[in-house]
Amino acid sequence: GLLDTFKNLALNAAKSAGVSVLNSLSCKLSKTC
């Protein structure tokens, strides 16, 4: 239902946020920015 949809949206947002944080961290570490 609506709650499941909201849960999925939140999970996807958290995933993409986590991915971008990881990407910026690894780029800083390897100095490829």
From Swiss-Prot:
Q: Does the entry annotate any disulfide bonds, and if so which pairs?
A: 27-33
Specify the domain of life of the species encoding this protein.
Eukaryota
Query: Sorted alphabetically, which InterPro entries does this protein's record hold?
Result: Antimicrobial_frog_2
Its GO CC terms are: extracellular region
Main location (coarse class): secreted
Claim: Disulfide bond is one of the keywords in the record? yes
Residue spans crossing the bilayer: none
Q: In which tissues is it expressed?
A: Expressed by the skin glands.
Q: Where in the cell is it found?
A: Secreted
Q: Which GO terms describe its biological process?
A: defense response to fungus; defense response to Gram-negative bacterium; defense response to Gram-positive bacterium; hemolysis in another organism
Keyword annotations of the record: Amphibian defense peptide, Antibiotic, Antimicrobial, Cytolysis, Disulfide bond, Fungicide, Hemolysis, Secreted
What's this protein's family per the entry?
Belongs to the frog skin active peptide (FSAP) family. Brevinin subfamily.
Per the entry, what this protein does is: Has antibacterial activity against E.coli ATCC 25992 (MIC=38 uM), E.coli CIB 84492 (MIC=38 uM), S.aureus ATCC 25923 (MIC=19 uM) and S.aureus CIB 85462 (MIC=19 uM). Has antifungal activity against C.albicans (MIC=19 uM). Has weak hemolytic activity against rabbit erythrocytes.
Q: Report what the protein is called.
A: Brevinin-2JD
Its source organism is Odorrana jingdongensis
